Amino acid sequence: MQRFWYGATVLNVIDGDTIDLMIDLGFDIHHKIRVRLYGVNTPESRTKDLAEKEMGLKAKSFTKDWLTNHKWVFVNTIPDKNDKYGRILARIYSSDDVENTTTACLNKDIIQSGYAREYFGVGDKTWAEFKKETK
């Protein structure tokens, strides 16, 4: 399976697992996309459940900080994969040097930080169920 890599500029962080990006397609062609972090689920930041909302805002803050603290951002798209809302599924990598050597992966880092969990779209559990399992 061939994957595609694009340089990107962050436009907006929607929540912990969704980002608006301007991707560089080359030849001075740019395209705005909404990306869902592949394999990642964060709590909702727009919910009436106050505990989940608090965690969702922390996850969003983590994502913003991660993107701000890395100089170069790259998108590794998952071919022919969109979520049910039409968002592109992708892994987000960063590099801190001009050689574009990837040094970190947002998808992995947000899960390891405890602000997200792995998710591949099947048998999703609520955050309350997930929290009980991790205690």
Regions found by a protein language model. Name each.
Residues 1-135:
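Small beta-barrel nucleic-acid-binding modules, primarily SNase/OB-fold domains
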